[in-house]
């Protein structure tokens, strides 16, 4: 089946991206790569081997699409503020005490910030608090752009400053409006398609995510 997929992709000039996140055997990733199918790497999920350190940008896969976050995560601004923990607690789907989740999450975020600083895309003095959050978001996208991955992607919600999750795993529509959340700016004002490029954050993130220098 993978061979047929690869053949059809070659015939039509199509790039195929596999979502190989989570519990996927390395042998599967190797087989997909053998057929030229790109994998997926998410900055927030990437550890350096079995350590608690973040993976260096140079150690990312070539045959992959790299993103800062995913559709199952809140926008980056919200993630920095612990919005993913707060929302799950409010919805009653948090399986551990919020304090435990928050402590672990902050430790991991700090590991990522340390790597960003090591690679020179984030000032070590910057902290992920309201005054510096946008600098952190920009640094994350510069980091993604610095990887050797074949493709990178920037989430639209990040480019307009939205803070609401588009999808909350483990819930149904009666608990959370999955995939029905309108695109808004940081002030929760609706953003229309024709207005996206004029958003203040759009140009900043586009420059940060551009390869070869912002």
Indicate residue ranges for each PLM-predicted region.
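Catalytic cores of glycan-processing enzymes that make or break glycosidic bonds
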Residues: 1-214
């Amino acid at each position: 089946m993978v061979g047929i997929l690869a053949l059809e992709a070659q015939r039509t000039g199509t790039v195929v991206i596999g979502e190989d996140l989570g519990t996927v055997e390395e042998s599967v990733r190797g087989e997909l790569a053998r057929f030229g199918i790109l994998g997926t790497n998410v900055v927030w999920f990437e550890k350096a081997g079995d350590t608690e350190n973040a993976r260096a940008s140079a150690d990312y896969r070539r045959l992959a699409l790299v993103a800062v976050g995913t559709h199952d995560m809140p926008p980056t601004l919200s993630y920095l503020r612990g919005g993913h923990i707060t929302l799950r607690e409010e919805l009653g789907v948090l399986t551990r005490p919020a304090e435990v989740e928050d402590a672990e999450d902050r430790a991991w975020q700090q590991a990522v910030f340390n790597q960003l600083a090591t690679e020179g895309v984030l000032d070590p003095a910057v902290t992920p608090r309201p005054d510096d959050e946008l600098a952190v978001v920009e640094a994350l996208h510069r980091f993604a752009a610095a990887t050797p991955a074949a493709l990178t992607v920037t989430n639209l919600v990040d480019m307009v400053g939205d803070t609401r999750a588009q999808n909350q795993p483990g819930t149904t529509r009666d608990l959370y409006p999955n995939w029905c959340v309108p695109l808004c700016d940081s002030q929760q004002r609706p953003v229309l398609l024709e207005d996206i490029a004029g958003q203040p954050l759009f140009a900043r993130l586009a420059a940060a995510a551009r390869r070869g220098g912002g």
